[in-house]
């Protein structure tokens, strides 16, 4: 019997990209997955084209894999970078055997068989029939609820290659979640470019609220959270619905990008300082709420005074987590033609915001000491073989950190199972906890 061909796949960028990578894995089940790229018959890099750093990572990854690939292997470049720069890349990168963008993930097996590059005009949106292979977890899955975005933020090129908002039907989402719940998945993260706009293209007034109600009724779903809310499409009613839900975590991930009115106007965010703060305060007023956001350092028009105002707000408000992005000047965006802030000033501002973010996270972690939390054990810790890595169910996967279990109370430990635990201490930026019981 001939040995199976081997596949090496790297998924770069966001979790939305990961879902598309999982669709490709589902179409290539006859291949054996290998971590060793030098022995792979097919190598796929699902690229990110969001900002300069991501573009650079994508190109470097592809070129490094090409240098190490075995003879007669097939190298595929898919995803956002490939879509965004399809003409230039096909001309400048003869190392690549197959180029494909954001429309053909479900046809990847056909493209490899015919060794043909294709760019479909429609953006692909995974459904319950995609046959994706969930990676990295036996209990958690990302559910993509929409593609594209109707916002017109000055700094963002995503609508230029992902198009307008295109939502999945509620029944499609319900079927996928139900199917995964029947397979034992119980924790779900709902994602898109602008999740709070979900359903607006289908004339659903409160699409996300409708989705919450549907998911709450699915047997086997224990926990869920929504990522990527957008201020101008987030309502007080949505905030209340999330807080009142028995299934959805009181978890608010809403990138604000800035807080100064003048900068927000230049960014074309559609919401000013006052309305943004009203939303954030309403979120923060909910019992045990967790708030995550992101900001941009050095957008054109950000004066020193605007920046200092942002710093003061981020220091004082009390976010549990926030990310800082260096402003990246992207062609096809309206900010591209604006007068740019020097890179050294952008770097300096981003560093200051990064330090504020660390202090903000530390204060959030300190509040957890002494609390009893529900957490799921993911496996042995990378820090120490005698410690276990766990994640509170409220936190998002990968981005919010881990809690280390240093005392199991002699309970039988099962990876992927939920336990009640008491957080006992904070060492540096690392929380430690003791298991109390299996839930």
Curated annotation (Swiss-Prot):
Swiss-Prot/TrEMBL keywords: 4Fe-4S, Cytoplasm, Iron, Iron-sulfur, Metal-binding, S-adenosyl-L-methionine, Transferase
Domain MTTase N-terminal span(s) in chain numbering: 5-117
Cofactor(s) demanded: [4Fe-4S] cluster
GO annotations of cellular component type: cytosol
Xref: InterPro entries: Elp3/MiaA/NifB-like_rSAM, Methylthiotransferase, Methylthiotransferase_CS, Methylthiotransferase_N, Methylthiotransferase_N_sf, NA-bd_OB-fold, Ribosomal_uS12_MeSTrfase_RimO, rSAM
PROSITE patterns noted in UniProt: MTTASE_N, MTTASE_RADICAL, RADICAL_SAM
SMART domains on file: Elp3 (SM00729)
A single GO molecular function term of this UniProt record: aspartic acid methylthiotransferase activity
Catalyzed reactions per annotation: L-aspartate(89)-[ribosomal protein uS12]-hydrogen + (sulfur carrier)-SH + AH2 + 2 S-adenosyl-L-methionine = 3-methylsulfanyl-L-aspartate(89)-[ribosomal protein uS12]-hydrogen + (sulfur carrier)-H + 5'-deoxyadenosine + L-methionine + A + S-adenosyl-L-homocysteine + 2 H(+)
Domain Radical SAM core, chain residue ranges per copy: 135-363
Positions with a binding annotation for [4Fe-4S] cluster 2: 149, 153, 156
Subcellular location: Cytoplasm
Keyword Iron set for record: yes
Co-factor note (free text): Binds 2 [4Fe-4S] clusters. One cluster is coordinated with 3 cysteines and an exchangeable S-adenosyl-L-methionine.
Amino acids binding [4Fe-4S] cluster 1: 14, 48, 80
Keyword S-adenosyl-L-methionine among UniProt keywords: yes
Any one Pfam family match given in the protein's UniProt record, by short name: UPF0004
EC code: 2.8.4.4
Domain TRAM: 366-437
Chief localization: cytoplasm
GO biological process terms held by the UniProt record: tRNA modification
PANTHER family: RIBOSOMAL PROTEIN S12 METHYLTHIOTRANSFERASE RIMO (PTHR43837), RIBOSOMAL PROTEIN US12 METHYLTHIOTRANSFERASE RIMO (PTHR43837:SF1)
Family the entry assigns: Belongs to the methylthiotransferase family. RimO subfamily.
Function statement: Catalyzes the methylthiolation of an aspartic acid residue of ribosomal protein uS12.
Protein name: Ribosomal protein uS12 methylthiotransferase RimO
Organism listed in the record: Sulfurovum sp. (strain NBC37-1)
Gene of this entry: rimO
């Amino acid at each position: 019997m001939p040995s199976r061909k081997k596949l090496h796949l790297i998924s770069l960028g966001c979790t939305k990209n990961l879902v598309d990578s999982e669709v490709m894995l589902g179409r290539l089940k006859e291949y054996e997955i290998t971590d060793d790229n030098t022995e792979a018959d097919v190598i796929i890099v699902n690229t990110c084209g969001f900002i300069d750093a991501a573009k650079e990572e994508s190109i470097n990854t592809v070129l490094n894999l090409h240098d190490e690939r075995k003879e007669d292997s097939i190298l595929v470049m898919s995803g956002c970078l490939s879509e965004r720069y399809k003409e230039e890349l096909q001309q400048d990168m003869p190392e690549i055997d197959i180029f494909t963008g954001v429309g053909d993930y479900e046809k990847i097996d056909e493209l490899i068989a015919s060794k043909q590059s294709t760019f479909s005009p429609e953006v692909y949106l995974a459904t319950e029939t995609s046959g994706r292979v969930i990676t990295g977890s036996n209990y958690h899955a990302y559910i993509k609820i929409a593609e594209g975005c109707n916002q017109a933020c000055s700094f963002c090129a995503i609508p230029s290659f992902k198009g307008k908002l295109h939502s999945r039907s509620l029944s499609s989402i319900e079927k996928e979640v139900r199917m995964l719940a029947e397979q034992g998945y119980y924790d779900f993260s709902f994602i898109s470019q602008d999740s709070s706009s979900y359903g607006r293209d289908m004339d659903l007034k409160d699409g996300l609220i409708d989705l919450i109600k549907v998911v709450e009724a699915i047997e086997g779903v224990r926990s869920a959270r929504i990522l990527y809310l957008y201020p101008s499409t987030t309502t007080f009613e949505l905030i209340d619905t999330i807080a009142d839900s028995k299934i959805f975590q009181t978890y608010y991930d809403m990138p604000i990008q800035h807080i100064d009115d003048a900068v927000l106007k230049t960014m074309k965010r559609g919401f000013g300082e006052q309305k943004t703060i009203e939303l954030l305060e309403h979120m923060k007023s909910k019992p045990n709420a967790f708030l995550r956001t992101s900001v941009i350092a050095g957008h054109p028009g950000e004066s020193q005074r605007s920046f200092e105002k942002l710093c003061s707000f981020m220091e004082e408000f009390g976010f549990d987590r926030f990310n800082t992005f260096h402003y990246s000047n992207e062609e096809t965006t309206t900010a591209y033609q604006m007068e740019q802030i020097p890179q050294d000033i952008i770097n300096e501002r981003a560093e200051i915001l990064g330090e504020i973010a660390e202090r903000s996270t530390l204060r959030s972690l300190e509040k957890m000491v002494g609390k009893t939390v529900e957490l799921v054990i993911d496996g042995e810790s990378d820090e120490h073989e005698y410690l276990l890595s766990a994640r509170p169910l409220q936190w998002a996967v990968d981005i919010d950190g881990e809690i280390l279990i240093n005392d199991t109370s002699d309970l039988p430990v099962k990876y992927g199972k939920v336990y009640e635990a008491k957080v006992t201490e904070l060492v540096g930026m690392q929380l430690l906890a003791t298991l109390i019981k299996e839930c």
